[in-house]
Amino acid sequence: MSEYLFTSESVSEGHPDKVADQVSDAILDAILAQDPKARVAAETLVNTGLCVLAGEITTTAQVDYIKVARETIKRIGYNSSELGFDANGCAVGVYYDQQSPDIAQGVNEGEGIDLNQGAGDQGLMFGYACDETPTLMPFAIYYSHRLMQRQSELRKDGRLPWLRPDAKAQLTVVYDSETGKVKRIDTVVLSTQHDPSVGYEELKNAVIEQIIKPVLPSELLTDETKYLINPTGRFVIGGPQGDCGLTGRKIIVDTYGGAAPHGGGAFSGKDPSKVDRSAAYACRYVAKNIVAAGLATQCQIQVSYAIGVAEPTSISIDTFGTGKISEEKLITLVREHFDLRPKGIVQMLDLLRPIYSKSAAYGHFGREEPEFTWERTDKAAALRAAAGL
């Protein structure tokens, strides 16, 4: 019986790029809490002893950006110079400009050529769902995130006190070529920053027994499963001291782990007038509802936009041969049941709220948090009825 391998990865909240994402989204949330109509593109760079805040912000909100950045870094766990990055001691520089009026006139209702609220930029966005996990996410990315959440949990509650904030996980999964179903887990890679006091064998055993095995389905772990734990043998220096971190550098971790294409636009630090974020969320909402409705077991949707124009320039759907109805019919149903204009997306998913900080680590999709409206399956019944199933 033929098989194939597929791999996805996740990173912890202490990974330098994720530190940057979380600072950017914390600043976005602080602004939206006061000014829901603000225009925000908040970028962050973190390096040894340094946090740089830059981008374009147009708002009436009064926010202490430096305080928000320090509080976010501290919450992640970088609160001591021993860790190489200290929330209280690092320098924080603020370099925000305002949004270009040329862009603003294309987004503001009643301005520009299209008087509706237009897209904040051109671009293409994808959404995906499949039936491999309870939250309709691909297996490898779903469980990579769960491993990283488990590492954070054991670090923060003191059960493994020698853990430090930076970590990465990677899963290689074996699929049956005929059924497309997960057969077993081939390789688990988990690298975690740690105190210098802990020995390698103690660390390796604790990671396997207390992080990996409680998270991964035991029936998919076999005698052949390979465990690669801190494969270099040492990971003391990490976080922003080990690598420079930037907002928007973990876009595959943020989405589907490579199981679906990506349009290239990052999410964190962007208000929902930016279709890079809001339309990608809407695409996930569409794909998840199609799979939840039983119209397909796999669904990928692409939408595209032109700057300043409200209506999508294209909508396409691929169900990879699993659809119960044609893809043309699915597109018709999507147009009837989902408003994919920028303003429609914001209203449909209630996006003008300070809900984004939680999304900045452990994935934007496949987490049934109350704030994550794009994970609801409230359109599934109507889609199924309209499809005549």
Swiss-Prot record:
Assembly information from the UniProt record:
Homotetramer; dimer of dimers.
Which of this chain's residues are annotated to bind L-methionine?
A: E56, Q99, D243, K274
Q: What is this protein called?
A: S-adenosylmethionine synthase
Its required cofactor(s), as named, are: Mg(2+); K(+)
One example of a Gene Ontology biological process annotation: one-carbon metabolic process
- Subcellular location(s) of the protein: Cytoplasm
What keyword terms does UniProt attach to this protein?
A: ATP-binding, Cytoplasm, Magnesium, Metal-binding, Nucleotide-binding, One-carbon metabolism, Potassium, Transferase
Q: What positions does the entry give for Mg(2+) binding?
A: D17
Q: Which PANTHER family match?
A: S-ADENOSYLMETHIONINE SYNTHETASE (PTHR11964)
Keyword NADP on this protein? no
> Positions of the region Flexible loop?
99-109
Source organism per entry reads Neisseria meningitidis serogroup A / serotype 4A (strain DSM 15465 / Z2491)
Query: GO CC terms on record?
Result: cytoplasm
Gene label: metK
Residues that hold K(+) according to the record: E43
The record's catalysed reaction(s) read: L-methionine + ATP + H2O = S-adenosyl-L-methionine + phosphate + diphosphate
Q: Which family does it belong to?
A: Belongs to the AdoMet synthase family.
Pathway, according to UniProt?
Answer: Amino-acid biosynthesis; S-adenosyl-L-methionine biosynthesis; S-adenosyl-L-methionine from L-methionine: step 1/1
Positions that bind ATP: H15, D166, A167, K168, R234, F235, D243, R249, K250, A266, K270
How is the cofactor bound here?
Binds 2 divalent ions per subunit. Binds 1 potassium ion per subunit.
HAMAP family listed in its UniProt record: S_AdoMet_synth1
According to the UniProt entry, its GO molecular function terms are: ATP binding; magnesium ion binding; methionine adenosyltransferase activity
State the EC number(s). 2.5.1.6
Q: Which InterPro entries match?
A: ADOMET_SYNTHASE_CS, S-AdoMet_synt_C, S-AdoMet_synt_central, S-AdoMet_synt_N, S-AdoMet_synthetase, S-AdoMet_synthetase_sfam
* Functional description taken from the UniProt entry: Catalyzes the formation of S-adenosylmethionine (AdoMet) from methionine and ATP. The overall synthetic reaction is composed of two sequential steps, AdoMet formation and the subsequent tripolyphosphate hydrolysis which occurs prior to release of AdoMet from the enzyme.
